[in-house]
Structure formats: structure tokens, C-alpha cells
């Protein structure tokens, strides 16, 4: 598995490069004015050099999080509880992050993210179980602030402070998404180098991330001005979101699909390490391969929905769910006790990540078109609750460290979950197949389809 993982990573990076090149040349550029504006380029650069260290710090923990808890000799059931606490924190933080960011200020929220994530990483140096749970809870809170705070600050400054055209926003976030893929791949390799090549142990990537967060905080304090969003009562936001869900069956189906799909992804995040680690798989390299597969999926989405191929986001969404179902079906066989096939499991995991790269932009496009902008925060809050509950219950109920086939049973249940998601997609498709609002124009792909 050692050499296989390295070859797979190189191949996936090459595939991503080819797909990204093809996607970039599949339609004419709509941002030539933005690229040629020196003030805009400088503003972008100032944002990126603050945002990217925070992204890198967030990614560095990914490859060795489960391994760290194993290194401290906790059982899989105990590790599952730590993860569930993180999911619970994400549920609560998801509900309050938007109003908190608006009231506290985006600049202060970015600083708060860095402080919370730093504290979370420092907690990982302790072997005390409740300290580790505290660290996971802090990590759950901080993850909800990452994208909402930084991107909300940039969007406000772009329009209000610098008065740049709104159509230039996708240029910034498209580039950020591409860089985010590269940063995630590099983070996996660096984490692998620290933990395995240098023999510093599974806690070392988290320690390495803290200086990056300090750098991000220093740049935010020195260079960014404060800005605030419109404040709405929490009850009103959630009430409006619930009414939108109940009055529009399409939104309810879309939320069900999101909860089913993403809860399976959360369980996959928990399971990939115990499946691959016993077979001498370099975890950082495997993580980088996952990120390369996801980035390739995002590039493939842009290519598939371009004017050259004319696929619609609904078709891509259906394809991504089919891919995950097939992957989970593979995993029920490749993880059978006494008959494990780690190479097949790795390929199945990579297919899941490729599907995620297709799923998220497709779901983002449909969400943007189906849910009114003023109600999106409230609706997304309601989406998050079943998502995290399904993931948490799946880990608590199904995973028994004393039962050899527990992992296989989890994949079987996840496959059934994806089958339910597929039925919801078919039901949604029958409702909206003639709805031109949910179709990309045949002349060119709209930027909103890849930015959500």
C-alpha cells in the first residue's frame, strides 16, 4: 500500500491539472477586466495572504486526527464519542455563527476563529479524554466561522469599501477554491512529512498549524478594517427558514438529500483511517489523494456543465449520489472481516471524494436557485440539524469496537442511506425537469453554479 498511495497521488494531481486546464478553456473568460485592474489584484492578494494560512491550518489536522486518538490508546467507541461531540458543536455553531458574525463583526470573528482553532490544537497535546473532547468542541465551533467570517468580510469590502463590480466576486472565489484544493493537497503531504518521515508523531501537524493561525491573526489585526452585517433575531431567521421548507416541497427534498449525503460523508471522515491504517498506508499521502480527487471532481463539474457538454446540475447531482452508492457497495465487500482488500477500499474512498467534488457545486447551484436569498441562512440551519444528528447517531449506534463486522455494517447502512438520497433526487427531478430556472443556459455556464 505504501507505493500504491504515492503513485495514486501523482496520478490524481496530473488528472486534476488536465481537468482544470480543460475547464478553464471550456468557455471564454468573463473576468478580463478584473484581472487587468491593479487595485483589484492588490485587494485580492491582501485577502489571500491572510485567508490561505487559515485554510492551511484547518487542513493540517485532517490526516492524523483519528490516528492521534488511537495513539493515546482510546478505543474506537471512545473516539466515536469525541467525533460526535464535534458534530454537536457544529450543529450549535451552525445555528448561531451567522448572527454572531454579524453582531460581533467579521474582522473580530476571523480573529475568534483563529483563537478557537489554536486552542483546539493545543488541547490535542493532552492525553486527558475530556480535554480532547473540549478540543473537538472548540474545533466544531471554529469550523463554522472559517468560511462565513472570511468570505463575508471580503464580500462586504469588495462592494462597500472598494466599489468593485459584483460580477468580479466569482473571480476571487473561483481562484480561492482552486488554491484551496492545492493547499489541502500540500497540507496532507506536510502532515505526512512531520508525523511519519520525521517521526514527530500524530500531534505534530496540529502544532505546526498554530504559527499559521498566529500569522493570520497578525495580518487581520494589522491590515483589515471591521465591518458588520445586518442583524436579525435568531427566532425570526429560523422561523422564516422553517416556513420556506414547509411551503416548498422542492426545498424540503433538497434539504433531505443534503442531510443524507453529507451525513454519509461525515461518517466516511471517521472511518477512512481505521480502514487504511492497519495496512501501512501513509495517512497524509492518502489524505492528499482524497483532496486531489475532490479537486478533480470540482474541475470535472465545471467542464461537464460548460457549453461544450451541456450537462445540468441536477444530472451531476444524481451522478454523484450514484457514485457514492457504488463506492459504499464496494466497501461492504472490501472491508469484510478476514478478507480485507485495502487497495479496493482506497479506490472506493477516492471515488467518494471525486463524487464530493461533483456534488458540492451542483448542490450549491440548486440551493441558490430554489431558496430565496433572504431565507437561505435559516433554511441551511434547518438542513444542518438532521445532517449532524444522522452522522452522530450513525457513529454511536452502529460502531461497536468489540464487533468485528461493525465497520462493514456501517458501510452497508450508509449505502442504504444513499439509496434513499437517490430516491429523493429522482422525486425532485420529476418535479423540476421542466423548470428553466433550475437549468444552466446553453450559451454559457453561470458563475453562481460553481461558487456555492
From Swiss-Prot:
CDD domains: MFS_MFSD5_like
One Gene Ontology molecular-function label: molybdate ion transmembrane transporter activity
GO biological process: monoatomic ion transport
Main location: membrane
Membrane topology of the entry: Multi-pass membrane protein
Residue intervals passing through the bilayer: 1-21, 45-65, 79-99, 130-150, 180-200, 201-221, 251-271, 281-301, 316-336, 346-366, 377-397, 410-430
GO cellular component, one term: plasma membrane
Coiled coil (UniProt feature): none
InterPro entries, sorted: MFS_trans_sf, MOT2/MFSD5
SUPFAM superfamilies linked: MFS general substrate transporter
Annotated function: Mediates high-affinity intracellular uptake of the rare oligo-element molybdenum.
Family of this protein: Belongs to the major facilitator superfamily.
Name of the protein in its database record: Molybdate-anion transporter
Gene, per the UniProt record: mfsd5
Amino acid at each position: 500500500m505504501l507505493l500504491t498511495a504515492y503513485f495514486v497521488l501523482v496520478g490524481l494531481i496530473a488528472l486534476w491539472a488536465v481537468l482544470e486546464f480543460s475547464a478553464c478553456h471550456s468557455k471564454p473568460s468573463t473576468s478580463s477586466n478584473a484581472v487587468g485592474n491593479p487595485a483589484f489584484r492588490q485587494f485580492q492578494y491582501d485577502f489571500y495572504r491572510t485567508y490561505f494560512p487559515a485554510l492551511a491550518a484547518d487542513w493540517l489536522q485532517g490526516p492524523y486526527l483519528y490516528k492521534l486518538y488511537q495513539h493515546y490508546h482510546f478505543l474506537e467507541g471512545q473516539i466515536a464519542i469525541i467525533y460526535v461531540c464535534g458534530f454537536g458543536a457544529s450543529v450549535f455553531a451552525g445555528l448561531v455563527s451567522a448572527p454572531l458574525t454579524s453582531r460581533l463583526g467579521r474582522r473580530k470573528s476571523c480573529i475568534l476563529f483563529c483563537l478557537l482553532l489554536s486552542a483546539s490544537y493545543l488541547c490535542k497535546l493532552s492525553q486527558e479524554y475530556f480535554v480532547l473532547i473540549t478540543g473537538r468542541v472548540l474545533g466544531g465551533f471554529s469550523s463554522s466561522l472559517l468560511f462565513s467570517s472570511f468570505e463575508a468580510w471580503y464580500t462586504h469590502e469588495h462592494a462597500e469599501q472598494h466599489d468593485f463590480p459584483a460580477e468580479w466576486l466569482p473571480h476571487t472565489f473561483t481562484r480561492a477554491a482552486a488554491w484551496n484544493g492545492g493547499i489541502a493537497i500540500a497540507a496532507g503531504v506536510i502532515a505526512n512529512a512531520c508525523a511519519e518521515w520525521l517521526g514527530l508523531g500524530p500531534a505534530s501537524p496540529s502544532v505546526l498549524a498554530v504559527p499559521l493561525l498566529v500569522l493570520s491573526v497578525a495580518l487581520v489585526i494589522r491590515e483589515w478594517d471591521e465591518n458588520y452585517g445586518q442583524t436579525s433575531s435568531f427566532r425570526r431567521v429560523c422561523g422564516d427558514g422553517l416556513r420556506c421548507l414547509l411551503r416548498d416541497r422542492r426545498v424540503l427534498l433538497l434539504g433531505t438529500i443534503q442531510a443524507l449525503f453529507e451525513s454519509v460523508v461525515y461518517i466516511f471522515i471517521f472511518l477512512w483511517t481505521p480502514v487504511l491504517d492497519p495496512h501501512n498506508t501513509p495517512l497524509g499521502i492518502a489524505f492528499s489523494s482524497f483532496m486531489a480527487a475532490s479537486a478533480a471532481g470540482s474541475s470535472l463539474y465545471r467542464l461537464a456543465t460548460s457549453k461544450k457538454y451541456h450537462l445540468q446540475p441536477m444530472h451531476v447531482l444524481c451522478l454523484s449520489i450514484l457514485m457514492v452508492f457504488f463506492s459504499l457497495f464496494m466497501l461492504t465487500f472490501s472491508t469484510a472481516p478476514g478478507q480485507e482488500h485495502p487497495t479496493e477500499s482506497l479506490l472506493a474512498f477516492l471515488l467518494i471524494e471525486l463524487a464530493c467534488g461533483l456534488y458540492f457545486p451542483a448542490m450549491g447551484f440548486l440551493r441558490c436557485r430554489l431558496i430565496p436569498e433572504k431565507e437561505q441562512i435559516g433554511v441551511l440551519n434547518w438542513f444542518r440539524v438532521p445532517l449532524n444528528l444522522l452522522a452522530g447517531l450513525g457513529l454511536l449506534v452502529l460502531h461497536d469496537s468489540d464487533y468485528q463486522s461493525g465497520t462493514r455494517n456501517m458501510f452497508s447502512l450508509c449505502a442504504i442511506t444513499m439509496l434513499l438520497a437517490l430516491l429523493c433526487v429522482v422525486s425532485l427531478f420529476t418535479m423540476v425537469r421542466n423548470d428553466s430556472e433550475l437549468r444552466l443556459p446553453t450559451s454559457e455556464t453561470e458563475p453562481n453554479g460553481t461558487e456555492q
